[in-house]
Regions:
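Extended mid-to-C-terminal alpha-helical interaction segments
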Residues: 1-127
């Protein structure tokens, strides 16, 4: 109906205004939340820009102004989740799968790159 259409347009415009008012720091925070909520899906820059209804270029520039990249945000989320899961005694295989890694080996390599130690060493150090 025309009334529903008008309401939908108003909601869309209001959402766009809120997105436009976000500061760069809020973009980073929002991206952290989106990446976390969509695990184990690999929430990439294209999905993020589609979700935020902006171009990848605009999102990339907004993050650049803050001095952070999408990849850094994604890595921060994955590292934080991995550490949390290791502390909760989840298996490395389960963690790897929950974070969207295709292989355990890939997760182990990423974790070592992030922290400087293997997941098993980190897990034993937190017990």
């Amino acid at each position: 109906s025309p009334a529903n259409y008008a309401t939908a347009i108003q909601i869309r415009e209001r959402a766009q205004q809120e997105i436009d008012q976000l500061s760069d720091a809020q973009y980073a925070y929002l991206l952290e939340q989106l990446i976390d909520q969509h695990l184990p899906i690999r929430f990439d820059m294209q999905l993020a820009s589609d979700y935020l209804q902006m171009s990848e270029r605009h999102l990339r520039r907004s993050l650049l102004l803050e001095g952070i990249s999408f990849q850094q945000i994604r890595q921060t989320v994955l590292e934080r989740k991995a550490k949390q899961m290791l502390k909760n005694n989840l298996s490395i295989g389960d963690i790897s799968q929950a974070l969207g890694f295709s292989e355990v080996r890939e997760f182990r390599r990423a974790f070592k790159r992030w922290t400087g130690q293997a997941p098993s060493v980190y897990k034993n150090g937190t017990e």
